[in-house]
Regions:
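N-terminal secretory signal peptides and thylakoid transit peptides that target proteins
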Residues: 2-22
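Short connector loops at helix/strand junctions that flank enzyme active sites
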Residues: 64, 78, 90-94, 110-114, ...
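Charged, gly/pro-rich active-site loop segments
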Residues: 40-45, 122-253
Length: 253
């Protein structure tokens, strides 16, 4: 059984949409594309920052697919994992992932507890010094960001074939994301793969509630948006490669 996933958009395409398209206009919210506004939201979202267009949210979730999986039963647990989104499966889509079988959060999966998946996008400090209107320049700094919360009940995946297909789909997704290598998961001896897979607990979450918060100056005066965009392009975080080198050199032994 394969997991019906859609091709992931490029990081450049998603960032261009977030930082230019959304900041410069309003995302279309026609009746067909909307998700119902949550009656009990998990995050505070001012109207100006609320995005409900499901296709837009799904594209974001596929691009920024390394999630925080949050559960509160039987105790608060947060696990950081890659995920796969099947956008056409279920009313709002279905999230697939896995955690270590030694992780205490397995108890929440086995119990069918409710979970929240947090998808984080670009974020950064915004200085009033970047802006041009008098109102903004006399104000205080802020932090712009994009995030999607998706909630639903955890369902364990125990069937060996479904477990294998989840791993294959997940690996294919990320191999394509780095441009591909000569590694072929599906070419490995399946019995050996499944022996190793006893160390994980796969799961799925059919999304029952989805919330998009995009705080990207879309409600600000046009001159401020135009002035801020090139400054955001110069905001560079340390890359994984750079931080890994730093960690190797400075971490306590």
């Amino acid at each position: 059984m394969s997991i019906p996933v859609s091709p992931s958009p490029s990081r450049r395409d998603v960032l261009a949409t977030l930082l230019a398209g959304l900041a410069g206009s309003t995302v279309s919210l026609d009746a067909e594309a909307q998700s119902a506004e949550p009656s009990d939201p998990s995050v505070y979202i001012p109207k100006a920052h609320l995005v409900q267009d499901r296709a837009f949210l799904h594209a974001f979730m596929r691009e920024f697919s390394f999630i925080e999986l949050v559960t509160t039963s039987p105790t608060l647990r947060i696990t950081h994992i890659p995920s796969v989104l099947a956008p056409a499966q279920g009313k709002y889509g279905t999230i697939f992932g896995h955690i270590s079988a030694q992780n205490d959060q397995v108890k929440a999966i086995r119990a069918g507890a409710r979970a929240l998946a947090v998808f984080r996008g670009p974020h950064g400090y915004v200085s009033p010094g970047w802006l041009v209107t008098d109102f903004s320049r006399q104000g205080v700094p802020t932090w712009n960001f994009a995030v999607v919360h998706a909630a639903g009940r955890l369902v364990p995946i125990d069937d060996p074939e479904r477990k294998y297909e989840l791993l294959a789909t997940l690996i294919d997704q990320y191999e394509q994301g780095i441009g591909g290598t000569d590694y072929r998961f599906r070419g490995l001896p399946k019995d050996e793969v499944m022996k190793r897979a006893t160390g994980i607990q796969p799961f799925e979450i059919e999304i029952e509630q989805i919330e998009g918060k995009f705080k990207l100056f879309q409600e600000r005066p046009e001159p401020d948006k135009v002035a801020a965009l090139p400054k955001l392009d110069t905001y560079r975080e340390r890359s994984l490669e750079a931080y890994t080198r730093h960690f190797y050199a400075t971490a306590p032994k």
